[in-house]
Curated annotation (Swiss-Prot):
GO terms for cellular component: cell division site; plasma membrane. Pfam families: ZipA_C (PF04354). NCBIfam families: septum_zipA. Residues 26-243 are cytoplasmic. It comes from Xylella fastidiosa (strain Temecula1 / ATCC 700964). The keyword DNA-binding does not apply. This is Cell division protein ZipA. Interacts with FtsZ via their C-terminal domains.
Length: 243
């Protein structure tokens, strides 16, 4: 073996040892630096799920941050302001149960105010009480809404004067029981409306837990409402007697 070959082998071995030494001594320092960097970062504030109407007004707010509840003012007829439209107002502030659905924008998108208004009109909803949309009993508007639709951003209303600038992550549909018809009939009117709104707005339908609304959940809701309707049927106090 020539001297040149031995020299090349020696240089290669020294090079390998040098690279290994650099890697060995630099890796712990880098890790320590990363640990210190993480410690120096202030802890992020953890946002707990909200159960109130205090929702951020940011148009890009994620639907995951939306509270699974309905603003109290929307089920309380005593909250009417002077001069406010009362079409869609409930005749009483009593309610037993609320069925809630969402239509949410797809990822990286929002729902535009103008599009919401057009879609609501196409699905037979009327703008009214509390400045939100309602589905009313045809020919009997005084009976109150079958269900209503609101913005998920507080206070839940639609500002028609600035509707062109409105962009929100989702809208909510709520069926307040007792309704002006049986609970199951009200649901059968609400569900296709919500699905059609999602189609018109290119959105997705979510349940009250903000999960995709599937057939199994729909079946469970129907069962719940059938049970509710049975509970509302009061048996006669006195049986008809035979003479």
């Amino acid at each position: 073996m020539s001297d040149v070959t031995l020299l090349r082998i020696g240089i290669a071995i020294v090079g390998i040892l040098f690279v290994a030494a650099v890697f060995f001594f630099s890796t712990p320092k880098t890790s320590a630096h990363r640990v210190r960097t993480k410690k120096e970062e202030p802890p992020r504030e953890r946002r707990e799920p909200m159960l109130s109407t205090e929702v951020d007004n940011s148009p890009h707010q994620s639907v995951d941050e939306v509270p699974a509840s309905v603003p109290q003012q929307q089920v309380n007829p005593e909250a009417t302001k002077p001069g406010e439209i009362e079409l869609g107002k409930r005749p009483t502030n009593h309610f037993d149960k609320i069925i809630l659905l969402f239509v949410a924008a797809k990822a990286e998108h929002t729902l535009r105010g103008e599009d919401i208004v057009v879609a609501a009109e196409k699905t037979g909803m009327i703008f009214g009480y509390m400045n939100v949309f309602h589905r009313l009993v045809e020919g009997y508007p005084e009976r109150g809404p079958i269900f209503s639709m609101a913005s998920i951003l507080k206070p839940g209303s639609f500002d028609m004067a600035n509707i062109r600038e409105m962009q929100i992550p989702a809208i909510s549909f709520f069926l307040t029981l007792p309704a002006p018809m049986t609970a199951l009939d009200a649901w059968e009117k609400m569900l296709p409306t919500v699905q059609r709104m999602a189609e018109l707005l290119d959105g997705v339908v979510l349940d009250e837990s903000r999960n995709a609304l599937g057939r199994q959940r729909i079946a469970h809701i129907r069962d719940e409402l059938r049970a509710y309707d049975r509970q509302q049927q009061v048996p006669p106090l006195i049986k008809n007697s035979r003479w």
